[in-house]
Amino acid sequence: MSRNQQLFDRAQQTIPGGVNSPVRAFRSVGGTPRFITRAEGAYMWDADGQRYIDYIGSWGPMIVGHAHPEVVRAVQETAAHSFSFGAPTEAEITMAEEICKLVPSIEQVRLVSSGTEATMSALRLARGFTGRDLIIKFEGCYHGHADSLLVKAGSGLLTFADTTQNAPSSAGVPADVTRHTMVLEYNNVEQLEQAFARHAGEIAAVIVEPVAGNMNLVRASDAFLKAMRELCTRDGAVLILDEVMTGFRVALGGAQAHYGIRPDLTCLGKVIGGGMPAAAFGGRRDIMARLAPLGGVYQAGTLSGNPLAVAAGLATLKLIQAPGFYDRLASQTRKLADGLAEAAKAAGVPFAADAIGGMFGIYFREGVPGSFAEVTRSDTARFNRFFHAMLDHGVYLAPSAFEAGFVSAQHDDAILAATLEAARKAFAAG
């Protein structure tokens, strides 16, 4: 029995399903999860000593690669002075200043510890600011596991939930909670316009992933985002961009810089923690002024602005501002996506791929999808076979057909070549 299997068997005795986040259980693809012992650069090693080229990157944060010396040094130096204080630090101010500098739509920012906290708090703030209850979200967009957002929420919920009904995607979420959440089709401008026409003056906020990464990678169209901005402005609703995944991942200023759109509030995470638990939400000063202790919208967190997370985040933000960083990252990611598509075509496999910044999506279907419905028509059985073949050849992809992939600054040409050679073998195997 492999060491991975031994650990999985042991884990299931004390951890529900043997994992602390459902997608890690390999339920979608089958087989035994890999228990990771260490990682460096673009590689990870499992408990059996197998090395993998990593295209998960801790689900996005590891944009400069695993265990980057400057990030490690920053954490070690901070840890020498204690791990947490429960009091303000100068580093928190520096982090806030850096975020506001790099993302101009953010005039003030509040640090939290997870993406779920960021989106949950941003929605509460939007409701408090507008005095309205109704929220619009979109099919396939995942904004964390807050109750009001678990409706057709993409990601692991595509694996575990019934997606045919406009109902909570998770047991334990009362229908009364989600009745204030309206779910619309991603990239459907007409449907969005109709919603605003029918509910004028009732909508507190629209929340959206500008590049959805939790129903695989699906880009928002320019027309969709433009309409969203115009409708929110006209109706007095708050536009929230969930950039937990895309922030500092698709461009230095996030997806909003790529698209040229200015939201009212932005949610960040992943990259800003450099692999540590950290997230943030911020935006217009007049909206943020409603947040406690200034205003009546309550939000708090014991570990918010944790010194170790802030240190890792600041070190990462410094590294990604190097000249040419994003040009090279985007080039390598596009090279990977195009190479995978070419390998599939040569093998006669229906397949498409897309890339933006350091994110990519692979789809076992003809054409790049533009909506949740199109994504769900992918050939998941074929993806599962491909996933295991790649794993056998030392390439670690996301263990779900409904997750985006991530490239780091450490994925050089030799690593891409090894990945594409593995892909050619995997496609040939069927």
From Swiss-Prot:
Keyword field contains Cytoplasm: yes
Pathway noted in the entry: Porphyrin-containing compound metabolism; protoporphyrin-IX biosynthesis; 5-aminolevulinate from L-glutamyl-tRNA(Glu): step 2/2
Keywords, ordered alphabetically: Cytoplasm, Isomerase, Porphyrin biosynthesis, Pyridoxal phosphate
A Pfam family of this chain: Aminotran_3
Cofactor: pyridoxal 5'-phosphate
Cysteine disulfide links: none
A single GO cellular-component term on record: cytoplasm
Broad enzyme group: isomerase
EC number per UniProt: 5.4.3.8
Compartments where located: Cytoplasm
InterPro entries to which the protein is assigned, alphabetical: 4pyrrol_synth_GluAld_NH2Trfase, Aminotrans_3, Aminotrans_3_PPA_site, PyrdxlP-dep_Trfase, PyrdxlP-dep_Trfase_major, PyrdxlP-dep_Trfase_small
Biological process annotations from GO: protoporphyrinogen IX biosynthetic process
Subunit structure comment from the entry: Homodimer.
PANTHER family: GLUTAMATE-1-SEMIALDEHYDE 2,1-AMINOMUTASE, GLUTAMATE-1-SEMIALDEHYDE 2,1-AMINOMUTASE 1, CHLOROPLASTIC-RELATED
Family stated for the protein in its record: Belongs to the class-III pyridoxal-phosphate-dependent aminotransferase family. HemL subfamily.
Full protein name: Glutamate-1-semialdehyde 2,1-aminomutase
Organism expressing this protein natively: Cupriavidus necator (strain ATCC 17699 / DSM 428 / KCTC 22496 / NCIMB 10442 / H16 / Stanier 337)
